Amino acid sequence: MLDMYVMVDGKKLRCGYTTGSCATAAAKAATIMLYNKEKLKTIDIDTPKGVRLHLDIEKINIGENYVECCIIKDGGDDPDATHGMEIWARAEKKDDGYTLKGGKGVGVVMGEGLYVAKGEPAINPVPRTMIESEVKSVLPKDRGVEITIFAPEGKKVAKKTFNPRLNIIGGISILGTSGIVMPMSEESLKQSVELEIRQKIANGHKDLILVFGNIGERKGMEMGLDQSKMVSISNYVGFALDCCRGNGVKDITLVGHIGKMCKIAAGCFNTHSRVADVRLEVLALELALMGYDIDLVKDVYNQKTTEGAVKFLGEGYDELYKRIAEKIAKRIEIYSYGEISPKILMFSMEKILFSE
């Protein structure tokens, strides 16, 4: 267990280590045991973060010309789908040189625009470098080794990750730019957003559909939007727009629930509740600007949620939602320096409020 902590919102949270670090440690340990003929209990590796990891070796299989061993992935206090997985490496003797392969449960990249070439195992560049460096540091002179990284539960676990959206088939990715999992980190989510945008562009899509998550994707499909153009952006509206602009995307459709959309209308481009919450303020202000009675404005403002406010208002407020959508579009145009032309699809849980 990694004894490293960070403070997030006043809470002490334990850090973990990436699948890339697990694969590196397993590969190094397997290589040592392959040529030294003795079992190890632990292994040390360096990480790009500058933290030296001391990891337990969970299981070992020894054959005539190969050794396999595994490290258990530990996500710390920010566990993802891969937390607790066995990440295995097989080291097999060869006459000379070093090669790296992906085995069972490690995905294969089937799309363009990712960090790894199409047809290659989904082992990202930093883990590839880490594995090669650590293995070569213990490989006897004039000896060779073939390393295969595999994860027996990878195919099942991958369904809970971004890999299906990124057209990575058959398993998980071996990831990590620092080797360390920082609790509550936005890095991995943002990286997935950027990768998905790049992949859509590489597949020939020049206009993209940005959704916040599964509900937005489903609503968009119900409205006839093309799923192959959809990018799930979580709360990172501004970051996604920056990625679109940086990759030459000129036209987007933003699909979202009125709660998150109201935040953008107010100029908030990170829609997480701990960053900003102006949902009811936007609705109340717009009603006031439209000249509605102050009692109605107060009633809307005092609702618990935007969903509740929409239900409270009932029918006959199409102009309200149109004005909010127009403000969202204007905010996006300003944010992107006029380089992105947006369309808006806004919904509540029960109905479409605005579509163009």
UniProtKB/Swiss-Prot annotation:
Gene Ontology biological-process entries: anaerobic cobalamin biosynthetic process; methylation
Q: What broad class of enzyme is this? A: transferase
**Which EC number(s) does the record attach to this protein?**
2.1.1.195
| Residue ranges of coiled coil | none
**Secretion signal: which residues?**
none
Kindly tell me the pathway this chain contributes to.
Cofactor biosynthesis; adenosylcobalamin biosynthesis; cob(II)yrinate a,c-diamide from sirohydrochlorin (anaerobic route): step 6/10
This chain's protein is named Cobalt-precorrin-5B C(1)-methyltransferase
Q: Name the source organism.
A: Clostridium tetani (strain Massachusetts / E88)
